[in-house]
């Protein structure tokens, strides 16, 4: 539908002319876009975008990480990982559970002898010999991620 009057004609006599009282149709008093981020808009940046400005340290690019980290424990040391109070409660039916990963060992190796007491061993890796010795004593090997 066509109008007989343009908006400017309609707004004649209204002081603010449709641009509000406060800003009074002034351009960009705070600057355009991200202007003043380190100056007059600093509080906003610090509150809502912490860490936006400033330097970032260097990555230690020459640090050689050991990707083959795998501490080992032998079969003859497994009983040393069982707490003393648990050793007294051990019976033929109830085997103690040894978590090698919690003790700081990833792999169980087969050196040494095991007593004829069954035990349940949790580790990331087992050598064949260690697995055979633990199973021969009536125990079990459980792989843990």
Swiss-Prot record:
* Compartments in which it is found: Cytoplasm, Cytosol; Cytoplasm; Rough endoplasmic reticulum
Q: Does the keyword Ribonucleoprotein apply?
A: yes
Where along the chain is composition biased (Basic residues)? 1-30
Q: What is its main location?
A: cytoplasm
Q: Which Gene3D superfamilies match?
A: 3.100.10.10
Q: Keywords on this record?
A: Cytoplasm, Endoplasmic reticulum, Ribonucleoprotein, Ribosomal protein
Which GO cellular component terms, listed alphabetically, does the Swiss-Prot or TrEMBL entry include? Answer: cytoplasmic side of rough endoplasmic reticulum membrane; cytosolic large ribosomal subunit; large ribosomal subunit
| GO molecular-function terms, A-Z | structural constituent of ribosome
Region called Disordered, residue ranges: 1-48
Q: Name one GO biological process term.
A: translation
Family, similarity comment: Belongs to the universal ribosomal protein uL15 family.
Question: What is known about its subunit structure?
Answer: Component of the large ribosomal subunit.
Q: What HAMAP family does the record point to?
A: Ribosomal_uL15
What is known about what this protein does? Component of the large ribosomal subunit.
- What is the name of this protein? Large ribosomal subunit protein uL15
Record organism: Oscheius tipulae
Q: Which gene encodes it?
A: rpl-27a
